[in-house]
Amino acid sequence: MRELLQQTIPNLTGEACDKFVAYYELLVDWNTRMNLTAITEPEEVVKKHFADSLAALPYLAPGVRTVDVGTGAGFPSIPLLIMRPDLKLTLVDSLQKRVTFLEEVLKTLGLSAQCVHARAEEFGRDPRFRASFDAALSRAVASLPVLLELTVPLLKVGGKAICYKGDVSEELKTAKSALHLLHCTAEVVPVEADYGARSLVICTKNAPTPAAYPRKPGMPSKKPL
């Protein structure tokens, strides 16, 4: 596992390598009791979860206040935090069991982050969090219009929503309305990967989000913008 990590992730320190190994062990152990990931083979986890999560590293300035919406088993936030402990991260998930897992990971790895159990739609309306982040990450399996409605309201004006995607050429066409309504502009950054097309869609928030968004829980996915 260590050799695999060192071959795959550039500039990996011994301490960070230890943390990735511990994270993998926790992931596989907890996955026997709850559904965290279908990917459990070491090589697959290192490439498709750990290394893939790190694609956003160049776009996160030191110390930026960052939120990971629908973090699930901790991707991309935990790998990013292992490499960049300076990040001020908030991890949001709708399932309490996953939040408990994330808190255990952070404690075991000696990392600091805030974990919140909430639906993304409700979190985006909470005045403590709305329009308060510099960056919003999402690697969740949802269409771009849905991800934008759940992430953009959390950003300060000038902040960036970073969505992890595959081939987005068709999805970008369907996201035009969401980009317009949420006052965003999008840039697609290809990500090098040997397991299929990967990209980051980086959306910059250019004006405050209208009060109507995000809509009530379930609506963004039922009726995408």
PLM features: what roles do these ranges have?
Residues F20, Y24, F50, S77, ...:
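A general structural signal for well-ordered alpha-helical segments in protein cores
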Residues G70:
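Conserved glycine-centered beta->alpha loop in an early N-terminal alpha/beta scaffold
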Residues A73-D86, E149:
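Conserved SAM-binding loop of SAM-dependent methyltransferases across substrates and taxa
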Residues L87-T90, S94-L225:
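S-adenosylmethionine
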